[in-house]
Regions:
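Intrinsically disordered, low-complexity linkers and terminal regions
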Residues: 1-75, 79-161
Length: 161
């Protein structure tokens, strides 16, 4: 009898824990449709998810947005996430990628940015974007940093770190 009561109480506790941890708020957004202007969109903190990692975007620093030719905009909480996602796309040259610049605090075209590899980023990859060249800090071009991401040369790699 005690085993049955214990099992019922344990089951009720587990069910209560599952119900209390459910996300019953508004659904999170990882893709917005209809951005035919191909400009970066305003992000509401806590409402948008990184399309690659599934984490909530709570800060603009190190974020990125990728706009597809059809106007679909994908959001990323780490610059390396957009690069890894971009490598899997068939139409890379038609996708407009925006990265958040740490020096001017606005979105800039990813191909025009300078990059650093030693930043503190949400996913720990270490890539930071800058609008202006800062000698000794932001010394990498777009193609160089995409190649680093493709090779796994990030701060998560113990041989790089």
């Amino acid at each position: 009898m005690i085993k049955k009561i214990f099992a019922a109480v344990l089951l009720a506790c587990v069910m209560g824990l599952l119900i209390s941890s459910m996300d019953i708020a508004e659904s999170k957004i990882s893709v917005r449709h209809g951005n035919t202007d191909k400009q970066p969109l305003q992000i509401e903190f806590g409402k948008y998810l990184c399309h690659e990692s599934g984490t909530v975007i709570n800060d603009l620093y190190n974020t990125a947005q990728a706009v597809m030719p059809n106007g679909d905009t994908y959001f990323f909480n780490d610059i390396a996430n957009v690069f890894m996602w971009l490598m899997r796309q068939k139409n890379k040259d038609e996708i407009v990628v925006w990265v958040y610049s740490q020096d001017t605090e606005k979105y800039i075209i990813a191909k025009d940015a300078w990059y650093s590899r030693v930043e503190i980023t949400p996913m720990g990859y270490g890539f930071g974007a800058y609008e202006f060249h800062n000698y000794g800090r932001s010394d990498y071009y777009y193609d160089e940093i995409v190649l680093c991401a493709a090779r796994g040369e990030t701060l998560l790699n113990p041989l790089i770190n």
